[in-house]
UniProtKB/Swiss-Prot annotation:
It catalyses: ATP + H2O + 4 H(+)(in) = ADP + phosphate + 5 H(+)(out). Its main location: membrane. Belongs to the ATPase alpha/beta chains family. It comes from Prochlorococcus marinus (strain MIT 9211). Transmembrane segments: none annotated. The keyword Repeat does not apply. It comes from the Bacteria. It is found in: Cellular thylakoid membrane. The record marks S363 as: Required for activity. The gene is atpA. This is ATP synthase subunit alpha. InterPro entries: ATP_synth_asu-like_sf, ATP_synth_asu_C, ATP_synth_asu_C_sf, ATP_synth_F1_a_nt-bd_dom, ATP_synth_F1_asu, ATPase_a/bsu_AS, ATPase_F1/V1/A1_a/bsu_N, ATPase_F1/V1/A1_a/bsu_N_sf. GO terms for molecular function: ADP binding; ATP binding; proton-transporting ATP synthase activity, rotational mechanism. F-type ATPases have 2 components, CF(1) - the catalytic core - and CF(0) - the membrane proton channel. CF(1) has five subunits: alpha(3), beta(3), gamma(1), delta(1), epsilon(1). CF(0) has four main subunits: a, b, b' and c. CDD domains: ATP-synt_F1_alpha_C, ATP-synt_F1_alpha_N, F1-ATPase_alpha_CD.
């Protein structure tokens, strides 16, 4: 028989009593009343905040959006196959946040900041709220530095500045994403952090974009946020805010950043889906009344900060897809009114072989010359006007049989300018190359070159300058302006290439 020692038992009991922690953990808990279509109706959760994260018992997270008298409407961020009627839900007391920092560069993440590229965890301790206030007027400075896209027609006629919001709008398959990707590739060596947000895209398309960025060496300064078409509507709605939060972190550190939202039409559709399922009253085109605010609070976060705030910037290039070129629909007009200009891509121009298919007539940059380098500003002043006049003349000349010499000359120059502005995809040009090409067209130096040979001429001119006149390229890239010496070198080079082409 085991002998029991009362003193040992009493000492154990005393020790346990001494170590007893009588703290009570209080958590705000509710019960799922109804679940379906990515929406949960929850009873309880009395102290929950609007926009607060809630956690279901299977670990799925949701966001409380509708706070009603007798229930809370929450959207689920994920499949939530384990959530059912009667499941418990607890409020977390937190608003959605996302990891940020240097370690994010080169990674592909979902809208919650979790890596989806199979390259392991992201080692960063910093985080930032997905929704945050845009900088106020005092914290901002007017846009004055160029954000070179590497696309001649944009940099010459519709210049974009650091801190600007420039909308890229057009029908499907007109090259909207191509312009955005070219702009990212052109930031190589410029110390600009790029964020590409893909909303509602096919996963294969996003994988293709990531591969192009990797090939061109652009992924090392780019972060990709992907909410593909198969993801929950809540994640598609959140993705642009996540992209903005990641870029803001770098902006407040004094860096220049570029964010591409591809595209906000899909985000608006996801928000409409969520709102209708939450039984919010529909408005025009069945969108909820606050869909304008959904986009304005996102795009207002783009800014050029003042010196006292570190002089960082966030440039936003939102993309909107139109139906049959209708820019007067609800979402396109909303975003046009929020942004500082738009680049309109036309399906007709695209199909006629003009790439990038920019309709110069209705494309505009409301920042304009303030964000242009002196070199391109000096020569591109008349370019937009000449092309707009050419479009009118071309339409008119279809009905005229005999045209006077001046009109024929103007039509000829317009055709050559059109050809000069054609550019291959993923092949952005530097400032010196753009200046050379535009100068040749605007000054009428290639009026004798046959129209079908203009593209070949532009390629040969760029090659000639790189090999024979490296000092010209270096000088334009450093000084960013044209002087008489540079102009004479340029004229000489253009005439040299032209004469060798015409002689062949």
């Amino acid at each position: 028989m085991v002998s029991i020692r009362p003193d040992e038992i009493s000492s154990i009991l005393k020790q346990q009593i001494a170590n007893y922690d009588k703290s009570v953990s209080v958590s705000n808990v509710g019960t799922v009343l109804q679940i379906g279509d990515g929406i949960a109706r929850i009873y309880g959760l009395e102290k929950v905040m609007a926009g607060e994260l809630v956690e279901f018992e299977d670990g799925t997270e949701g966001i409380a959006l509708n706070l009603e008298d007798d229930n809370v409407g929450a959207v689920l961020m994920g499949e939530a196959l384990g959530v059912q009627e009667g499941s418990t839900v607890k409020s977390t007391g937190k608003i959605a946040s996302v990891p940020v920092g240097q370690a994010m560069l080169g990674r592909v993440v979902n809208p919650l900041g979790q890596p989806v590229d199979g390259n392991g965890d992201i080692a960063t301790s910093d985080s930032r709220l997905i929704e945050s206030l845009a900088p106020g007027i005092i914290k901002r400075k007017s846009v004055h530095e160029p954000m070179q896209t590497g696309i001649t027609s944009i940099d010459a006629m519709i210049p974009i500045g650091r801190g600007q919001r420039e909308l890229i709008i057009g029908d499907r398959q007109t090259g909207k994403t191509a312009i955005a990707i070219d702009t990212i590739i052109n930031q190589k060596g410029q110390d600009v952090v790029c964020v590409y947000v893909a909303v509602g895209q096919k996963s294969a398309s996003v994988a293709q974009v990531v591969e192009v960025l990797r090939e061109k060496g652009a992924l090392e300064y780019t972060i990709v946020v992907n909410a593909s078409a198969s993801e929950a509507a809540a994640l598609q709605y959140l993705a642009p805010y996540t992209g903005a939060a990641i870029a803001e972190h770098f902006m407040y550190q004094g860096k220049a950043t570029l964010v591409i939202y591809d595209d906000l039409t899909k985000q608006a559709q996801a928000y409409r889906q969520m709102s209708l399922l939450l039984r919010r009253p529909p408005g025009r085109e069945a969108y909820p009344g606050d869909v304008f605010y959904c986009h304005s609070r996102l795009l207002e976060r783009a800014a050029k900060l003042s010196e006292s705030m570190g002089s960082g910037s966030m440039t936003a290039l939102p993309i909107i897809e139109t139906q049959a070129g209708d820019v007067s629909a609800y979402i396109p007009t909303n975003v046009i009114s929020i942004t500082d200009g738009q680049i309109f891509l036309s399906a007709d121009l695209f199909n006629s072989g003009l790439r990038p298919a920019i309709n110069v007539g209705i494309s505009v940059s409301r920042v304009g010359g303030a964000a242009q380098t002196k070199a391109i500003k000096k020569i591109a002043g008349t370019l937009k006007l000449e092309l707009a006049q050419f479009d009118e003349l071309a339409a008119f000349s279809q009905f005229a049989s005999d045209l006077d010499e001046a009109t024929q000359k103007q039509l000829g120059r317009g055709k050559r300018l059109r050809e000069l502005l054609k550019q291959a995809q993923f092949a952005p040009l530097n400032l010196a190359e753009q200046v050379a090409v535009v100068y040749a067209g605007v000054k009428g130096l290639i009026d004798e070159v046959p129209v079908e040979q203009v593209t070949q001429f532009a390629g040969e001119l760029r090659e000639y300058l790189k090999t024979s006149k490296p000092d010209y390229i270096k000088q334009v890239l450093t000084e960013k302006k044209l002087n008489e010496e540079i102009e004479s070198v340029l004229k000489e080079s253009i005439n040299e290439v032209k004469s060798s082409m015409l002689a062949a």
